[in-house]
């Protein structure tokens, strides 16, 4: 029995050793599995990131390829259009050059023929002049010889009268002969000139015939081209008529489709014309505003720098907050890992205790203890697996949340960039609007509001000698007030208004505007003075008034009438004098202020 017990105990020890080894190997396998799982997760994440990058690069490259293909197509179309245009221009230039060359050649030929004719005429004239000169020289020599002979004969001997008469007749006959010779020579010269002119005219006739033939050939070619164009036009008209008949035929298929296409074509042509007009106007506007935009570049750059530094600081703070959050999560995970390592070490220490102290224990106690440990081990394995699953799920959730947070962060950053760009564009437009206002708004004059007043309108005024004296006194006071300085004029005006119980709606001090007005706030005063009502005034002399009273026979009532009419006339004169004084004071006390249209650095700072 003891041998069996020892054998069983040895077997139990071997089984426990094997279990411990199996547990140790299982832990090692679990650790390796976790490491492999973590490596697999990392590889999967890296693979996903690289796949996303490659997909993004692929999408970007596809877009670039599409854009480049479209650009190549557009460039090829433009090249073909340019080639056709250049061919047409080259043909037109060739035709124009051919025509101009032909015209120049004809002009040069005409000039050459004219020069030839002039040269022939000059040669002929030179020849004729030489011949005349020779004849004149011969005649002169002959005459000189005759004179010499006559002088010798007169000196040597006295000649008879008959000989002298014969000699005179001979000289006269020779003179006639010479005159006839000269006439013959002149006629020959004229004949030669006429022959030259005839030859030149014949050459011109030949040249004109050649030009006529060329023009006839050109006319024939133009006529043939016109006939061909007419034939082509007739063919096109026939085709157009067939197309219109087919379009108007309701039984033909695709009529509505062709009509829709035609309507769309017409609409697109109209839209194209509108867009061309808009493009031209915008092009002019851009060329006009380019100079204005160059002035605002410095201010806009400073504003963008300020805004960019602010956004970078906010982005940096957000990134620091995210880093702190991730550091806290890492610390929490490290604490959990430390706890698990402590539990693992405790479990290994419990399993590695020597079992020599339990040699005296009973077999049933050892089996019970081993079963209990086995149950605990299974339970711990299950908990470990569940925690691993939860940990992997939490990791995936954390990765998903981090990816989502990064996407949201990117979107937020892009939105901030767009906001920054929109604000900068808004600032640009505001600055541009201010400059355009400064440039194009005319200098407006600040009008001083005219004070409203109340006047009594009397249909008839009858003056008396006393009233004339009062009017003279009022005019004297008015002259005295006009000589006063502006401050005293205002005081006198206000005092007179207080005495007459007429209130001003606006004080004179409110009319004075500050000199430092901004160029963007132009004051538009809409208050305008009311038009004065018309009233009839009849002023008569005292003699006329007395005559009227005598005619009417109301002499005893005249003092009462004058006393009654005296009061309203006095009131009216006082109101008129006060209004005149008020106008003069307001006009003299307020200076007109002009606002400069040029943009100064102080005004630009106020705009910023």
From Swiss-Prot:
Coiled-coil stretches: 1-445
Subunit organization: Interacts with KNTC1 and ZW10. These interactions appear weak and may be transient or indirect. Interacts with dynein intermediate chain and dynactin (DCTN1). Interacts with the catalytically active form of USP45.
Protein function: Required for the localization of dynein and dynactin to the mitotic kintochore. Dynein is believed to control the initial lateral interaction between the kinetochore and spindle microtubules and to facilitate the subsequent formation of end-on kinetochore-microtubule attachments mediated by the NDC80 complex. Also required for correct spindle orientation. Does not appear to be required for the removal of spindle assembly checkpoint (SAC) proteins from the kinetochore upon bipolar spindle attachment.
The name this protein goes by in its record: Protein Spindly
Region (Disordered): 465-487
Annotated organism of origin: Mus musculus (Mouse)
This protein's encoding gene: Spdl1
InterPro entries, A to Z: SPDLY_chordates, Spindly/BICDR_Dynein_Adapter
Domain of life: Eukaryota
Cellular component GO terms held in the UniProt record: centrosome; cytoplasm; nucleus; outer kinetochore; spindle pole
Location of this chain's protein in the cell: Cytoplasm, Cytoskeleton, Microtubule organizing center, Centrosome; Chromosome, Centromere, Kinetochore; Nucleus; Cytoplasm, Cytoskeleton, Spindle pole
GO biological process entries: cell division; cell migration; establishment of mitotic spindle orientation; mitotic metaphase chromosome alignment; mitotic spindle assembly checkpoint signaling; protein localization to kinetochore
Residues carrying Phosphoserine: 516, 518, 558
Stated family: Belongs to the Spindly family.
UniProt keyword list: Acetylation, Cell cycle, Cell division, Centromere, Chromosome, Coiled coil, Cytoplasm, Cytoskeleton, Kinetochore, Mitosis, Nucleus, Phosphoprotein, Ubl conjugation
Maturation and modification: Monoubiquitinated with'Lys-48' linkage. Deubiquitinated by USP45.
Residue numbers carrying N-acetylmethionine: 1
Molecular function via GO: enzyme binding; kinetochore binding
């Amino acid at each position: 029995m003891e041998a069996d017990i020892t054998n069983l105990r040895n077997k139990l020890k071997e089984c426990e050793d094997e279990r411990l080894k199996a547990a140790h190997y299982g832990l090692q396998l679990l650790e390796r599995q976790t490491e492999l799982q973590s490596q697999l997760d990392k590889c999967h994440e890296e693979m996903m990131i690289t796949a996303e990058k490659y997909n993004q690069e692929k999408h970007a490259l596809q877009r670039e390829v599409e854009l480049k293909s479209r650009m190549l197509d557009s460039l090829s179309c433009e090249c073909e259009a340019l080639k056709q245009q250049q061919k047409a221009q080259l043909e037109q230039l060739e035709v124009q050059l051919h025509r101009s060359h032909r015209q120049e050649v004809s002009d040069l030929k005409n000039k050459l023929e004219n020069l030839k004719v002039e040269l022939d005429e000059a040669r002929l004239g030179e020849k004729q002049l030489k011949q005349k000169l020779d004849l004149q020289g011969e005649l002169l020599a002959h005459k000189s010889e005759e004179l010499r002979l006559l002088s010798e004969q007169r000196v040597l001997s006295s000649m008879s009268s008959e000989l002298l008469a014969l000699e005179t007749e001979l000289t006269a006959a020779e003179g006639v002969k010479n005159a006839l010779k000269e006439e013959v020579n002149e006629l020959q010269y004229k004949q030669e000139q006429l022959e030259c002119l005839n030859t030149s005219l014949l050459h011109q006739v030949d040249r004109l015939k050649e030009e006529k033939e060329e023009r006839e050939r050109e006319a024939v070619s133009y006529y043939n081209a016109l006939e061909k164009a007419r034939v082509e036009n007739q063919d096109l008209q026939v085709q157009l008529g067939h197309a219109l008949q087919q379009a108007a035929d309701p039984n033909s298929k695709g009529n509505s489709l062709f009509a829709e296409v035609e309507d769309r074509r017409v609409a697109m042509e109209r839209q194209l014309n509108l867009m061309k007009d808009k493009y031209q106007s915008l092009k002019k506007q851009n060329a006009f505003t380019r100079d204005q935009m160059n002035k605002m570049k410095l201010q806009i750059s400073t504003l963008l720098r300020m805004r960019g530094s602010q956004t970078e600081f906010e982005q940096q703070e957000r990134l620091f907050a995210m880093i702190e959050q991730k550091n806290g999560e890492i610390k929490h995970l490290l604490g959990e890992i430390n706890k698990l390592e402590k539990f693992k070490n405790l479990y290994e220490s419990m399993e590695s205790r020597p079992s020599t102290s339990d040699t005296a224990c009973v077999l049933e106690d050892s089996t019970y203890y081993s079963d209990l440990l086995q149950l605990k081990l299974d339970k711990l394995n299950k908990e470990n697996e569940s925690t691993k699953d939860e940990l992997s799920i939490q990791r995936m959730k954390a990765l998903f949340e981090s990816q989502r947070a990064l996407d949201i962060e990117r979107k937020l950053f892009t939105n901030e960039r767009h906001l920054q760009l929109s604000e900068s564009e808004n600032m640009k437009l505001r600055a541009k609007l201010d400059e355009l206002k400064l440039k194009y708004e005319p200098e407006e004059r600040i009008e001083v509001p005219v004070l409203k007043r109340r006047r009594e309108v009397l249909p008839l005024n009858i003056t008396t000698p006393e009233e004339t004296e009062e009017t003279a006194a009022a005019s004297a006071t008015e002259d005295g007030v006009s000589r006063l300085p502006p401050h005293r004029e205002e005081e006198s005006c206000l005092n007179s208004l207080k005495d007459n119980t007429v209130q001003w709606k606006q004080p004179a001090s409110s009319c004075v505007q500050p000199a430092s007005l901004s160029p963007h706030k132009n004051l538009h005063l809409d208050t305008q003075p009311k038009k004065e009502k018309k009233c009839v005034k009849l002023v008569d002399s005292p003699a006329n008034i007395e005559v009227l009273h005598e005619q009417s026979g109301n002499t005893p009532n005249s003092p009462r009438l004058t006393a009654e009419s005296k009061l309203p006339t006095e009131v009216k004169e006082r109101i008129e004098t006060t209004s005149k004084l008020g106008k003069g004071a307001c006009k003299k006390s307020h200076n007109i202020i002009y606002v400069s249209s040029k943009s100064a650095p102080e005004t630009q700072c106020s705009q910023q």
